[in-house]
Amino acid sequence: MSYSTKFKSHFYGPFRDVAKSSPKGFDRSSYQLPVADKKKAINSSINNAAQGANYLMVKPGMTSIDLIKDIKKETLLPTGAFQVSGEFASLQMLSKANFGNYIDLLRESLVVFKRAQSDFIITYGARDIAKYL
């Protein structure tokens, strides 16, 4: 599986903080894509497919949801989404601030991935949602 479309994103923050892997003087833009460049994102996935990837993934998933269908169409490969730490944390924070039920928010975010034709979803909420399936 290839992180074929990995954007430079602020939504990686919570994971980087916990893993103590925040860039210090290191620019990840050499391998992370600019968020606004849809064409570059799709071309990155096409290149990964040409190099032998058998599954493709967009990351962060929620902010890349518009790409899933296009990548599948261009590559004919199963394409999924990774709901990264910041996206997952935002659902938890909404719930803690009484802006919604955590499971309902999580379920909605996952249903939208499926509606966007995601073949698989990676989420930090997998254990939580599994209790409700």
Where are these regions (language model features)?
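Alpha/beta enzyme core
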Residues: 1-133
